[in-house]
């Protein structure tokens, strides 16, 4: 279609658009002053001029567009990749194609020009200062330098985005145009396009507006865009003027409207609780993007509130719609001036409106929601007007209350006389005014009579007083009842019905007057009542539960006050310790007006509404009150206050420690409510611990403080039910807790607005919460504006179901969890927000947008955050990031984490100085669309892909057609591993290409700008290899581009053999390896084992983390071992190793072999000699059977030694039997022999007879060998020894040794048994050591004792060494051989060698014996002389010679008692001794015998002391010698006897001559000394038998071997 007169057509379109703009401006903009209007007109004129220029340019472009259709179609197809996803059903018209083709061509030219300029400037910069390799510490300096250089360059070639560019922002790239008209045109187009992106998305989602308008040609599109730009510019100017001048809103002249955003403050209890810096920073960040005049916000709000098909309306048009004053019903309050909508009108509490009126005038200044002029601004007008009416009427009501009391000036005075005087003056004043007021007094000491009630004669009972009031006074007079100080017990319920006005006043205030009762106290019906300065306390009773609390005839539902269609004001009162678990609040209001001011509710308990219960179109005003520790016992809840189907206004009040199941402090159930400047602390409940908002309610919460409220389910601060509209402004939420949402939990499908509020948490938190704000209802709208969220450990916004979150001009900092969690078709919009200093230890992003949800982020700043990622989006979701800034952040994954067909659109982004792991900006699975345009990436670091990291494919197929990368700049980016800009984790599925992009100084540690994942590998396996030769195998990995696979360590290589095909080869060593960042991998210490000549294929498998694998096979042949080595099959089937046997060294074998042969010859010779001389007495002396047993044991030991030269399973089993037999045979034989000697010594028998009977020997030895035999049999059966190899693969050596898993149990038992025998034998040897054989006799038991010692030492030494050097073949060989050979040599030397010596050297032995005897005689003679010398010396000193030495001690003799005829008489015995025998006469012939006995005893004692043994044979010999001496020396004996007899006789006669006694004593001592020095004769030493009383040997008995 060709237009012949285009200028006329353009002019008509321009006029139409101008009229539309004027109309929209009049409807939606704010009226400014004349100066601002002039400025706007000038701006509009300028824009109109620009639009004319744009139209001319567009016409010129259209006239110059004459390209070929095929080429145009190709270009258009590339351009529509982005648009194709939104509208696939319709194809653009020819006019639209021409328009887009011309546009694309021009943009391509501009991009090329811009690219060339950038490259030239970069080259200049590099030539001036050589760039260093990127390092993190130089990042800030590099960026600053680059910014300074690039800013000049960009300003010369690029016109930045005009509506968001300022000096604090970095570079935002838009389309590059050079001419002024093109810049202005592009400026308007960009602004319009940005504002329309949200509108287009919403309209397309609901299939209302197509992406491409087919009904208009390209000229009309341009004109419409210009007109829209004019409108937008006007709106922006108006908004700026509005923010600076605080103008009033359009169509509303109310002076009480909202002020500008810069003057807003958050005030709670007259204290500024928000930092001025925070408020100023929040206000300063507001731009024209999101406000009442902005096109994008207006479109979103209009769409959400005016569309009929989306199921969401902005206002709740329900029967209890409290903001619509034009839908009045017949339900009119009969008590006060309110209609059913509860809109307070001006003058409602004025004196002129005291009478009840049936009709009510409309409120002024309100708008009809159904009016066509209803818009976003007028909505706030409704709220502001309603709030203004509340404030005005509350002030009027308080003033009216104080005026009606009449005594506000004298209320606090406690002087009664002063009060009486003031009252008289007041009464006189009232009479002059004509006011009918009647005053009554009540006192505890008053009396009830007809004349009571005055100040002098007060009444006692209030009920009596009210009953006595005349009917006329009830209707026409104001009754004021004063309570004197005291405590009043109300015993009967007081009913006040149809009174005009009753005022109950406590004189001197609430601290002096208290009302109490044990039942319900007051009922007010159709009455105006004031309660001032009273305390109601200690009311405790129970009443029956109420079935229907809303029946009008069911009166008495409140514990203290019941209001029915009445007006009540409570001022300066206290309600304490009131309990009625079946009541509806301490104060119950039904269809009434209740005002409570400066009042305390403490420790009140009720079923529902612990303090106040307002219902059924009541109006409840609570001002400056405190609710503390109130409880609602019924699950309906309302710990402090409930307002049901009523209007509630709370201001400057505090709620502490209240408790209920639902609504720990306040429940709002229907109606319009305002909570202003109040505090909620330490309240608890199941839900809504501070405020519970039930369905069909509209609540305005402003300037409130919520601190440490606890909910066991959710909504610790506020819980909203369905169909509620909630406005939260200038509030602070701090340290609240619930398992759900600790700030706000909403099930409303309508509107929740939060503005200028602070949500503060603790890190670490005292108690963890799931979220801060939670929207659980479908199709809900959450609007957050100018708020701050910091210090939270839970999710801040939890948006479920298809709901909408719009957040603007808000701050998020120092949080440690997600910001948004949205799923199930939710819509998230963030505009002009800042996120900084946040951290997230979880694996998901701080914005989680899943399950077909959409996220739009415009002009958002992210800086100094340490998180896993910013955006996590899965399952067909969409994310838009427009005109934003991401700087100085640290990501554990990447900024975007998307998968499962999720689309990403990034435009005009500054991404700088960020550190990330896999994927700096985007990490995608290639299943969704990606568009990154007009963006700058500078100074970023990542492990892989600073721009995009393409992860492994998910279950969906890749969507390559939707990848768009255009007009981007990449500067100074660095990758720790590979892929500086783009990295494909898998093989390339979609090619990466960037149109008109610039890349400068981007580096990677290992790879290039673009790298891919693992594709294939190669190895260095040889074709032939000996068995088990250590050989490394080197692998190298490659990517899909044929380059080395760099920067990754995620490939696992396995080397294996297919045993099903090749079962004659085995593989050991490090057969698994992991790839390194340098692409190389090594199999270390690989041993391929098999019999020489085996052929097989080795398989190398590369396992990827996607559970995929790549397999390559290599043929290999096993060849023979090297010289000096043999193949050994160790460790398994076909596990051959080329090893050197080092089990027994040659030197050890030679030495042990020669030694064993020599010992064997010695044993053989010994056996032969023993057999030959078996009948000789010297052999019979030891018992030949005993010697034969010893030789048999030696043979077992020698056999085991020779067997140990070969280590096989059979030899191990033989040795396990022979070695224990050897030791136990030897041990048992010598033990029995030694035990025989011990028995002889203990029995004091003839010591020369040490032979053992054969039967005794065999029986005893068999008995000892029973236990070893059993243990050896068990070891052979249960723990059989077998051969085991001990090899060292590094040294390539092998050793064979005997091994049994559980043999150590048998060994321990054998060792314990062996050592028990040996230790007992050692003890016997020690016991027998005192025995000294006669010189020249053969002492065999001495050699046996030595042999026992030797055997014990051998075992004690060898067993620890064997355990210390366990599993050593050489140690095993030596320990089995050396101890056995040493013991056999000891046996031959100690048992057999002495016998052979006696056999072959008899003469020599006798000669030696004689020489020994002669030597002993000489020694005896010398000893005699010494003793005589001692005796002579001691005799002169009158001392007993026997006491000179311990050998002559008579202590043993003196200790004995017995007859004087005993042979054992002490040598020291004298007649002077104090014994019982001193006076007995002794015959003369007995004295010699006594002397002889004394001498004999002395000799016996000497022998015993010297030998330490009771040797009876020596005693007998000494007796013989002494008798001979007595016979040879009769003269001496007679003289000594005579002298002794004389001494005895003198003593017996009783004479006491000292000289004679001394003489006798000296003679007796001489005789005793003489006899004591006598020695045995030599012949007695040589006699084998004793001469005195000894038993002769039988011929069969063996004598000493010397006599043989």
UniProtKB/Swiss-Prot annotation:
Bias-annotated ranges (Basic residues): 1563-1572
Protein name as annotated: Metabotropic glutamate receptor-like protein R
Subcellular location: Membrane
GO cellular component: membrane
Coiled coil: 98-133
Extracellular side: 28-1149, 1206-1211, 1278-1304, 1362-1372
Compositionally skewed regions (Low complexity) per UniProt: 38-69, 1471-1527, 1534-1556
Cytoplasmic side: 1171-1184, 1233-1256, 1326-1340, 1394-1604
Gene3D superfamilies: Single-stranded right-handed beta-helix, Pectin lyase-like
Record's keyword terms, sorted: Coiled coil, G-protein coupled receptor, Glycoprotein, Membrane, Receptor, Signal, Transducer, Transmembrane, Transmembrane helix
Intrachain S-S bonds: none
Entry annotated with the keyword NADP: no
Signal peptide: 1-27
Family annotation (Pfam families): 7tm_3 (PF00003)
Alphabetized GO MF terms: G protein-coupled GABA receptor activity
Homology family: Belongs to the G-protein coupled receptor 3 family. GABA-B receptor subfamily.
Annotated Polar residues bias: 1573-1584
Region (Disordered): 38-72, 213-263, 1457-1604
Glycosites: 285, 327, 359, 375, 489, 498, 525, 577, 593, 624, 768, 837, 841, 851, 864, 876, 885, 888, 913, 967, 991, 1097, 1109
Gene: grlR
Membrane topology term: Multi-pass membrane protein
Transmembrane feature ranges: 1150-1170, 1185-1205, 1212-1232, 1257-1277, 1305-1325, 1341-1361, 1373-1393
């Amino acid at each position: 279609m060709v237009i012949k007169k285009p200028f006329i057509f353009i002019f008509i379109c321009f006029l139409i658009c101008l009229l539309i703009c004027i109309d929209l401006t009049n409807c939606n903009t704010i009226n400014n002053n004349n100066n601002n209007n002039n400025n706007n007109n000038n701006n509009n004129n300028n824009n109109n001029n620009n639009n004319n220029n744009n139209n001319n340019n567009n016409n010129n472009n259209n006239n110059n567009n004459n390209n070929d259709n095929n080429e145009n179609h190709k270009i258009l197809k590339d351009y529509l990749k982005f648009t194709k996803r939104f509208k696939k059903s319709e194809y653009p018209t020819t006019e639209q194609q021409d328009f887009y083709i011309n546009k694309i061509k021009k943009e391509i030219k501009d991009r090329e020009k811009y690219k060339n300029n950038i490259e030239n400037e970069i080259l200049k910069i590099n030539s001036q200062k050589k760039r260093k390799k990127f390092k993190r510490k130089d990042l800030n300096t590099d960026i600053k330098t680059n910014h300074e250089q690039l800013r000049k360059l960009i300003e010369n070639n690029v016109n930045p985005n005009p509506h968001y560019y300022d000096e604090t922002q970095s570079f935002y790239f838009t389309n590059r145009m050079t001419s002024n008209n093109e810049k202005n045109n592009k400026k308007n187009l960009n602004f319009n396009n940005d504002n329309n992106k949200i509108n287009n998305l919403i309209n397309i989602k609901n299939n209302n507006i197509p992406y491409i308008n087919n009904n208009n040609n390209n000229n009309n599109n341009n004109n419409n865009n210009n007109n829209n730009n004019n409108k937008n510019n006007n709106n922006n100017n108006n908004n700026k003027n509005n923010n600076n001048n605080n103008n009033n809103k359009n169509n509303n002249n109310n002076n009480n409207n909202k002020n500008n955003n810069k003057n807003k403050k958050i005030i709670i209890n007259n204290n500024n609780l928000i930092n001025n810096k925070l408020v100023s920073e929040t206000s300063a960040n507001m731009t024209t993007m999101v406000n009442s005049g902005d096109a994008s916000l207006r479109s979103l709000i209009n769409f959400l509130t005016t569309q009929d098909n989306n199921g969401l309306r902005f206002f709740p048009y329900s029967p209890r719609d409290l903001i619509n004053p034009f839908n009045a019903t017949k339900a009119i309050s009969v008590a006060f001036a309110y209609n059913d909508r509860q809109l307070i009108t001006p003058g409602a509490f004025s004196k002129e409106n005291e009478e009840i009126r049936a009709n009510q005038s409309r409120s002024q200044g309100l708008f009809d929601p159904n009016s066509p002029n209803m818009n976003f601004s007028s909505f706030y007008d409704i709220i502001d007007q309603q709030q203004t009416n509340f404030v005005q009427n509350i002030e009027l009501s308080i003033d009216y209350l104080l005026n009606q009391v009449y005594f506000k000036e004298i209320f606090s005075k406690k002087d009664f006389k002063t009060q009486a005087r003031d009252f008289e003056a007041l009464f006189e004043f009232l009479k002059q005014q004509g006011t009918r007021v009647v005053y009554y007094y009540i006192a505890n000491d008053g009396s009830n009579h007809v004349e009571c009630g005055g100040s002098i004669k007060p009444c006692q009972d209030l009920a009596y007083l009210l009953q006595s009031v005349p009917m006329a006074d009830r209707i026409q007079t104001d009754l004021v009842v004063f309570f004197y100080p005291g405590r009043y017990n109300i015993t009967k319920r007081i009913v006040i019905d149809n009174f005009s006005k009753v005022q109950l006043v406590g004189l001197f205030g609430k601290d002096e007057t208290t009302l109490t009762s044990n039942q319900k106290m007051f009922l007010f019906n159709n009455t105006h009542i004031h309660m001032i300065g009273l305390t109601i306390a200690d009311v405790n009773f129970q009443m029956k539960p109420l079935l229907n609390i809303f029946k009008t005839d069911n009166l008495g539902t409140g514990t203290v006050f019941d209001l029915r269609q009445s007006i009540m004001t409570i001022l300066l009162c206290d309600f304490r310790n009131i309990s009625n678990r079946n009541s509806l609040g301490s104060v119950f209001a039904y269809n009434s007006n209740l005002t409570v001011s400066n009042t305390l509710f403490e420790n009140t308990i009720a079923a529902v509404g612990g303090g106040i219960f307002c219902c059924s179109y009541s109006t409840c005003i609570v001002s400056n009150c405190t609710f503390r520790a109130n409880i609602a016992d019924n699950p309906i809840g309302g710990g402090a206050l409930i307002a049901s189907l009523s209007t509630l206004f709370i201001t400057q009040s505090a709620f502490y420690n209240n408790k209920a199941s639902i609504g720990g402090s306040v429940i709002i159930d229907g109606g319009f409510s305002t909570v202003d400047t109040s505090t909620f602390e330490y309240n608890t409940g199941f839900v809504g611990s501070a405020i519970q908002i039930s369905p069909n309610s509209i609540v305005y919460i402003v300037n409130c403080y919520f601190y440490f409220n606890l909910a066991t389910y959710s909504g610790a601060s506020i819980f909203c039910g369905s169909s509620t509209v909630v406005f939260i402004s200038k509030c602070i939420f701090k340290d609240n807790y619930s398992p759900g949402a600790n700030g706000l939990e909403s099930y409303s499908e309508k509107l929740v607005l939060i503005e200028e509020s602070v949500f503060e948490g603790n890190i670490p938190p005292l108690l963890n919460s799931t979220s801060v704000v939670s929207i659980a209802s479908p199709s809900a709208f959450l609007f957050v504006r100018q708020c701050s969220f910091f210090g939270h450990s839970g999710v801040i916004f939890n948006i479920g179901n298809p709901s909408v979150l719009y957040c603007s001009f808000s701050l998020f900092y120092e949080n440690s969890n997600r910001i948004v969690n949205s799923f199930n078709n939710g819509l998230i919009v963030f505009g002009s927000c800042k996120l900084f200093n946040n951290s997230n230890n979880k694996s998901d992003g701080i914005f989680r947008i899943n399950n077909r949800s959409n996220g739009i982020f415009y002009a958002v700043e992210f800086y100094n955050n340490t998180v896993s990622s910013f955006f996590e989006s899965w399952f067909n979701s969409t994310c838009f990031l427009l005109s934003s800034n991401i700087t100085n952040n640290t990501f554990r994954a990447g900024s975007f984490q998307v998968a499962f067909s999720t689309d990403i659109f990034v435009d005009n982004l500054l991404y700088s100085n960020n550190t990330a792991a896999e994927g700096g900006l985007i990490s995608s699975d290639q299943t969704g669309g990606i568009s990154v345009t007009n963006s700058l990436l500078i100074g970023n670091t990542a492990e892989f892909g600073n721009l995009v990291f393409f992860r492994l494919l998910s279950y969906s197929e890749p969507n390559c057609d939707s990848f768009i990368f255009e007009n981007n700049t990449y500067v100074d980016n660095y990758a720790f591993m590979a892929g500086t800009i783009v990295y494909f984790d898998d093989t390339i599925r979609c090619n990466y290409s960037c149109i008109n992009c610039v890349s400068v100084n981007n580096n990677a540690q290992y790879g290039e700008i673009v790298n891919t994942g693992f594709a294939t590998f190669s190895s260095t396996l040889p074709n032939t290899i000996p068995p088990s030769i250590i050989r490394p195998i080197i692998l190298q990995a490659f990517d899909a581009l044929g380059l080395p696979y760099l920067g990754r360590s995620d490939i696992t290589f396995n080397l294996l053999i297919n045993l099903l095909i090749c079962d004659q080869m085995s593989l050991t060593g490090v057969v698994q390896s992991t790839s390194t960042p340098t692409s190389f991998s090594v199999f270390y210490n690989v041993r391929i084992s098999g019999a020489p000549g085996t052929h097989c294929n080795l398989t190398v498998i590369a396992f990827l983390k996607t559970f995929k694998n790549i397999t390559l096979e290599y043929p290999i042949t096993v060849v023979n071992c090297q010289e000096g080595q043999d193949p050994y099959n160790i460790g398994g089937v076909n596990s051959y190793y080329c090893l050197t046997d080092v089990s027994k060294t040659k030197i050890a074998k030679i030495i042990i072999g020669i030694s064993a042969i020599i010992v064997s010859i010695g044993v053989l010779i010994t056996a032969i000699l023993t057999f030959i001389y078996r009948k000789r007495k010297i052999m019979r002396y030891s018992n030949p059977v005993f010697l034969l047993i010893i030789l048999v044991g030696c043979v077992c030991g020698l056999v085991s030694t020779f067997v140990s030269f070969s280590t096989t399973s059979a030899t191990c089993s033989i040795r396990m039997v022979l070695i224990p037999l050897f030791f136990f045979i030897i041990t048992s034989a010598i033990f029995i022999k030694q035990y025989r000697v011990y028995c002889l010594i203990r029995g004091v028998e003839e010591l020369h007879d040490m032979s053992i009977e054969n039967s005794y020997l065999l029986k005893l030895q068999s008995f000892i060998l029973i236990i070893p035999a059993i243990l050896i049999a068990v070891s052979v059966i249960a723990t059989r020894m077998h051969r085991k190899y001990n090899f060292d693969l590094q040294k390539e050596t092998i050793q064979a040794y005997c091994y049994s898993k559980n043999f150590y149990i048998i060994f321990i038992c054998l060792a314990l048994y062996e050592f028990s025998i040996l230790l007992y034998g050692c003890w016997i040897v020690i016991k027998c050591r005192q025995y000294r054989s006669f010189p020249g006799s053969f002492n065999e038991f001495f050699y046996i004792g030595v042999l026992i010692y030797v055997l014990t030492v051998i075992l004690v030494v060898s067993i620890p060494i064997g355990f210390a050097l366990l599993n050593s073949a050489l140690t095993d060989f030596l320990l089995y051989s050396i101890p056995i050979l040493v013991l056999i040599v000891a046996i031959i030397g100690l048992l057999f060698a002495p016998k052979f010596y006696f056999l072959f050297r008899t003469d020599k032995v006798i000669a030696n014996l004689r020489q020994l005897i002669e030597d002993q005689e000489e020694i005896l003679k010398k000893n005699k002389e010494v003793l005589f010398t001692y005796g002579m010396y001691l005799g002169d000193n009158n001392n007993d010679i026997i006491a000179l030495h311990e050998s002559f001690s008579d202590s043993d003799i003196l200790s004995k008692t017995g007859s004087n005829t005993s042979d054992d008489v002490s040598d020291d015995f004298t007649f002077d001794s104090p014994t019982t025998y001193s006076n007995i006469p002794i015959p003369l012939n007995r004295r010699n015998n006594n002397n002889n006995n004394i001498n004999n005893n002395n000799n016996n004692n000497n022998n015993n002391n010297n030998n330490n043994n009771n040797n009876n044979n020596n005693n007998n010999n000494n007796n013989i010698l002494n008798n001979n001496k007595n016979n040879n020396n009769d003269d001496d004996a007679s003289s000594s006897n005579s002298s002794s007899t004389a001494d005895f006789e003198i003593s017996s006669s009783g004479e006491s001559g000292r000289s004679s006694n001394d003489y006798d004593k000296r003679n007796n001592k001489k005789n005793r000394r003489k006899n004591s020095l006598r020695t045995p004769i030599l012949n007695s030493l040589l006699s084998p038998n004793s001469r005195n009383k000894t038993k002769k040997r039988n011929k069969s008995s063996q004598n000493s071997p010397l006599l043989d």
